[in-house]
Amino acid sequence: RAAMAEFYRLTGRRYGLIESHQMEDAEYAILAIGSTAETAIGSIDHIRAHEGIKVGVVAITSYRPFPAVEIVTALQHVKAFSVLERLDIPLGPDNPLTTDIEASLAKAAMGSPGFPRLTTMPICYSGSAGLGSRDVTAGHMVAVARNMAGATQGKRYFTLGIDHPLALTVEEEPDVRPAGSFSIRGHSVGGYGSVTTNKVIATMIGDIFGFPVQASPKYGSEKKGLPTNTYLTTTKEGKILTHSELQQVEFVPLMDPTTWNMGNPCVGLQEGGAIFQHTDVEEPQRLWDALPIWAKYFMVDHHIRFFGVDTVRIARACCKSDDSLIQRFQGVVLLGVFLRVTPFKAEAGMSDDALFSKVEAPLRKYFGKKGEAVVADNLRAVRMGYEEVFEVPRAIMEATPAAVLAKGKEEWDAKGKDVNAFFI
């Protein structure tokens, strides 16, 4: 505790050995460490409101020394609790954190000095989550709460995120982002510079508009030439607590038009959202006509805005200093598209000149070492993407024959809804 107090004095950030969230009236609790605990914290408002389960979270900050008394104090009035750990040790009685918590409760039940005396022993559930770097999601937290609070006793040991006899079923992925959030799920091909583009967009959102942002890619050299995704969320208020691939998004850029044949990029796109597609055609009607009819149905039905521009043409026109960078310049063009399509500039009341005076700083941060010519090329690519991207008019979309949209609905209903599955 003294060390935590000293840390607060030096940094202004206060941490306890544990951090309790909505435990005052909780009947059930989820205990975890790190990002798993943050995901649980971000999910409990939804669980309380939509599941009617009074659940709280105990985030464990210190594993050694173990905060036994603090944990027992937090759990002394709950009916049951679930411990989530990112490992599975089958040769032990339980996973390590679960074992320590059970031992702490046992010491309290035996009347050990310093512990609160327990009148009843809460039921302990233990789960393995995030194995093999898998995501832990809000949907998992809903399943954990249901497992504890169901009419029949749930699985005392369970897994999350893997196909296993002990796995809990996830029936939905609720949207637990803070109010006012804006999320992007990019679909690209490894080697197109999408990772760098995502980093630059994140930097621009923070530096230009002052919003907190979380960004992550599916990253790895093995992705080169293969379909991949990037993810980004920003919010004007609150804290982004979830750390997983995004389902609910407002903007979906497609850097490769063949993405329409390799999955379902429309999954989770919110009402009134936007899709951008690289295209070598310049007529909105031709871009619309080339879409699969299930995508047309979804866009018309959900009032999606649809944009396009030839990123390859712009990349070739702008990349004068190094021809080997042309492919990656397609991602730079997307920066301009992002600034045009998203609402941030308009909401900030910023002129084009003011905007582009601020764009140069993040570009220089990432490309400045390559020389002034490269920075200038990048800035030109961003501006051309911003100025030349075009929108398919709503009139063209709604002129689609009703019979085509009806057939598109049939295909949409039959189509897979897993954004990560290809060829569905």
Language-model region placement:
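Glycine-rich nucleotide cofactor-binding loops and adjacent beta-alpha elements
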Residues: 131-152, 156, 161-168, 341-343, ...
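Active-site cofactor/cluster-binding pocket
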Residues: 65-69, 80, 84-86, 175-424
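Thiamine diphosphate
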Residues: 3-163, 234, 276-280, 286-300, ...
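Active-site phosphate/pyrophosphate-binding segments
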Residues: 1-24, 133-134, 140-215, 219-224
